[in-house]
């Protein structure tokens, strides 16, 4: 377990999965959640804080190895984060001396394991394919939305809008991503993905994350894109996704969508009283 000693300030760990980077705070045994929206915003500032795409807070949870809460760098909450879940699972498995863990998130109970090749895999649960579950603003088919480019919508505990394009590299990711994120069709805003088919069951994927902007990778986005591609007949259910920060693997099975990929622990530290005061 990371050093959370109060004498040296609140402890944290920096991790990333395929370049999708996180601050992890372990609040187990501390009497409840410690992170606030203000603290998340302060920590998320890459110039004045630590910087991250998402923050993951580990809490005590009866009947599971932990509960897990997610925050975006703008201080908003996120219902799920696939790569952060994999990173925290790696940390917990090392801490507990096991190769499998169970975590509770807003998405529900998730199971993670370490594969024989060393990659960390997590079952992200069944995709949400009904308009009311994602959610969208009104009833419609979710595999072909009434927007320019006819994207798909998939929920993975958070909403995703997926465009299949000829060349993902040519997309104005910042411009189009920001515009689609706040489209009225998505009452809770949305993550935005642009994907190109580059080989059998291989996709090039670029991501604009709700509340974070452009990120090098997105686990739930990889899952949503793989599901959307399979629904359209572009790929099978086992897909390799090549993102700016690395490669993620998705396997859509009957029991849920499995996300696999690398995990890296970067450093540990403690937040100063001055940083805590910014919260």
UniProtKB/Swiss-Prot annotation:
Gene3D superfamilies (alphabetical): Diaminopimelate Epimerase, Chain A, domain 1
Catalytic reactions on record: (2S,6S)-2,6-diaminopimelate = meso-2,6-diaminopimelate
Superkingdom of this protein's organism: Bacteria
Gene Ontology MF, one: diaminopimelate epimerase activity
EC number(s) reported in the record: 5.1.1.7
Major site of localization recorded for this protein: cytoplasm
Database matches in InterPro entries: DAP_epimerase_AS, DAP_epimerase_DapF
Record's subcellular location: Cytoplasm
Keywords: Amino-acid biosynthesis, Cytoplasm, Isomerase, Lysine biosynthesis
Pfam families: DAP_epimerase
Could be important to modulate the pK values of the two catalytic cysteine residues (site feature) positions: 160, 209
PROSITE patterns: DAP_EPIMERASE (PS01326)
Top-level EC class: isomerase
Binding-site residues, substrate: 20, 54, 72, 82-83, 158, 191, 209-210, 219-220
Protein name: Diaminopimelate epimerase
UniProt source species: Cereibacter sphaeroides (strain ATCC 17023 / DSM 158 / JCM 6121 / CCUG 31486 / LMG 2827 / NBRC 12203 / NCIMB 8253 / ATH 2.4.1.) (Rhodobacter sphaeroides)
